[in-house]
């Protein structure tokens, strides 16, 4: 059972990007599990940031709306891209490091 996750990046009240978790573009849709984690998928937050990068759109100052609490890797990418708020709907394997790094960078982490 795969979790379905979506992410919107919003800046100045406009959606600048969207992403959902899915297989790596151009690769076969096959499950490759290593260390109990799927290796062939890209997370929703990663896809949204990559979409901005491909189109030359800055994420600086944007808000991320995510269906689920972000993993630590996605959190680091969101923070490094300049996201200033992360809002999520559902708790999912909440990692305390996400709160820690958000706090270090004064990024609001808000459960909706």
At which residue positions do the language-model features occur?
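Zinc-dependent deaminase catalytic domain
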Residues: 1-112
């Amino acid at each position: 059972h795969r979790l379905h996750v979506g992410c919107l990046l919003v800046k100045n009240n406009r959606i600048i990007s969207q992403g959902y978790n899915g297989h790596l573009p151009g690769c076969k849709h096959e499950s490759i599990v290593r260390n109990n984690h799927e290796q062939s998928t890209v997370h929703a937050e990663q896809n949204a940031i990559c979409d901005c990068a491909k189109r030359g759109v800055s994420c600086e100052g944007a808000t991320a709306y995510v269906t689920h609490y972000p993993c630590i890797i996605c959190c680091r990418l969101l923070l490094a891209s300049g996201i200033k708020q992360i809002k999520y709907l559902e708790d999912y394997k909440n990692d305390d490091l996400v709160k820690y790094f958000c706090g270090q960078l004064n990024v609001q982490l808000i459960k909706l």
